[in-house]
């Protein structure tokens, strides 16, 4: 039987079920078999792996994963696609499809129920553009024993995730992701590979989980506030952005001056010039200032 992703078979499946794409769900189905196989290769998927897939669509990528993996657990939010998936994937007995929103799913419980715990846990997904960041951060911060993730997303977002300090793309998202994972932008997927065709190209990003966060800080909440505030207005200096974030009262200014001096960071520095380690150091210096005591926790 032809691969699900074969353009002609994809058209037949969509026609048979009278499927209409929902823009609100960011539905774009990949119909390039070569790229699908490259995604599976990027995940280094073998029979030693259990795989969570997000957004299987009509099963094009699911099929390729199922041929390599031990078990596959797919989350599909669109209930119209459930009967389609039961049809297209009925030959793959190692696939379970759940009609659930990944952001609302109790992942530890579901993993324990559907996987035996004896295999590596990997995640592969073609993420809808409109909800890429929430899903990605949800997975990274869930505390799951993820060995490897391979996510397809908008090229611009991928470049921000993979960005280094000093680059225009470097920002709070770069830091949030790189704290938890080593990141690599693997390859670009042209918009012509999808049905319907999106407006922009996509990219495949590989994530390898860190055993420990890249940095540890005394106060994670304060660190998050610091990073968020520092990048709030990219053209402004760290000094201006941090006053806007924490306040312009004299005691706050004094605390900021002391912390910046202790961390050996000039107030005129811009956020994109700081490494993650420097942000961690500055966060700990702020945490030692009495004026920031109320922000601890």
UniProtKB/Swiss-Prot annotation:
<keyword id="KW-0963">Cytoplasm</keyword>
<dbReference type="InterPro" id="IPR020598">
    <property type="entry name" value="rRNA_Ade_methylase_Trfase_N"/>
</dbReference>
<comment type="function">
    <text>Specifically dimethylates two adjacent adenosines (A1518 and A1519) in the loop of a conserved hairpin near the 3'-end of 16S rRNA in the 30S particle. May play a critical role in biogenesis of 30S subunits.</text>
</comment>
<dbReference type="InterPro" id="IPR020596">
    <property type="entry name" value="rRNA_Ade_Mease_Trfase_CS"/>
</dbReference>
<feature type="binding site">
    <location>
        <position position="101"/>
    </location>
    <ligand>
        <name>S-adenosyl-L-methionine</name>
    </ligand>
</feature>
<dbReference type="InterPro" id="IPR001737">
    <property type="entry name" value="KsgA/Erm"/>
</dbReference>
<dbReference type="InterPro" id="IPR029063">
    <property type="entry name" value="SAM-dependent_MTases_sf"/>
</dbReference>
<feature type="binding site">
    <location>
        <position position="76"/>
    </location>
    <ligand>
        <name>S-adenosyl-L-methionine</name>
    </ligand>
</feature>
<dbReference type="GO" id="GO:0003723">
    <property type="term" value="F:RNA binding"/>
</dbReference>
<protein>
    <recommendedName>
        <fullName>Ribosomal RNA small subunit methyltransferase A</fullName>
        <ecNumber>2.1.1.182</ecNumber>
    </recommendedName>
</protein>
<feature type="binding site">
    <location>
        <position position="126"/>
    </location>
    <ligand>
        <name>S-adenosyl-L-methionine</name>
    </ligand>
</feature>
<dbReference type="InterPro" id="IPR011530">
    <property type="entry name" value="rRNA_adenine_dimethylase"/>
</dbReference>
<dbReference type="InterPro" id="IPR023165">
    <property type="entry name" value="rRNA_Ade_diMease-like_C"/>
</dbReference>
<keyword id="KW-0489">Methyltransferase</keyword>
<keyword id="KW-0949">S-adenosyl-L-methionine</keyword>
<dbReference type="Pfam" id="PF00398">
    <property type="entry name" value="RrnaAD"/>
</dbReference>
<keyword id="KW-0808">Transferase</keyword>
<dbReference type="GO" id="GO:0005829">
    <property type="term" value="C:cytosol"/>
</dbReference>
<dbReference type="GO" id="GO:0052908">
    <property type="term" value="F:16S rRNA (adenine(1518)-N(6)/adenine(1519)-N(6))-dimethyltransferase activity"/>
</dbReference>
<feature type="binding site">
    <location>
        <position position="28"/>
    </location>
    <ligand>
        <name>S-adenosyl-L-methionine</name>
    </ligand>
</feature>
<keyword id="KW-0694">RNA-binding</keyword>
<keyword id="KW-0698">rRNA processing</keyword>
<comment type="similarity">
    <text>Belongs to the class I-like SAM-binding methyltransferase superfamily. rRNA adenine N(6)-methyltransferase family. RsmA subfamily.</text>
</comment>
<feature type="binding site">
    <location>
        <position position="30"/>
    </location>
    <ligand>
        <name>S-adenosyl-L-methionine</name>
    </ligand>
</feature>
<feature type="binding site">
    <location>
        <position position="55"/>
    </location>
    <ligand>
        <name>S-adenosyl-L-methionine</name>
    </ligand>
</feature>
């Amino acid at each position: 039987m032809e691969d699900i992703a074969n353009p002609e078979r994809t058209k037949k499946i969509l026609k048979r079920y009278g499927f209409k794409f929902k823009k609100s769900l960011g539905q774009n189905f990949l119909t390039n078999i070569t790229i699908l196989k490259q995604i599976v290769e990027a995940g280094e998927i073998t029979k030693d792996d259990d795989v969570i897939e997000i957004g299987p669509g009509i099963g094009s990528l699911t099929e390729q994963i199922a041929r390599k993996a031990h078990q596959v657990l797919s989350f599909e939010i669109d209930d119209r696609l459930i009967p389609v998936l039961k049809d297209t994937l009925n030959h793959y007995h190692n696939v379970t499809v759940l009609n659930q929103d990944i952001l609302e799913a109790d992942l530890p419980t579901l993993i324990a129920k559907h996987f035996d715990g004896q295999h590596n846990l990997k995640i592969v997904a073609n993420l809808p553009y409109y909800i890429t960041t929430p899903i990605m951060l949800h997975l990274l911060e869930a505390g799951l024993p993820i060995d490897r993730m391979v996510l397809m997303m908008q090229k611009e977002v991928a470049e921000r995730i993979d960005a280094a300090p000093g680059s225009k793309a470097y920002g709070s998202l770069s830091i949030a992701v790189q704290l938890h994972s080593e990141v690599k932008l693997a390859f670009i997927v042209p918009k012509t590979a999808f049905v319907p065709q999106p407006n922009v190209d996509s990219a495949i990003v590989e994530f390898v989980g860190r055993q420990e966060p890249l940095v540890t800080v005394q106060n994670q909440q304060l660190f998050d506030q610091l990073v968020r505030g520092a990048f709030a207005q990219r053209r402004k200096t760290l000094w201006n952005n941090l006053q806007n974030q924490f306040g312009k009262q004299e005691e706050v200014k004094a605390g900021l001056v002391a912390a910046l001096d202790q961390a050996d960071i000039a107030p005129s520095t811009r956020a994109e010039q700081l490494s993650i380690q420097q942000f961690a150091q500055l966060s700990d210096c702020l945490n030692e200032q009495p004026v920031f005591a109320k922000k601890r926790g």
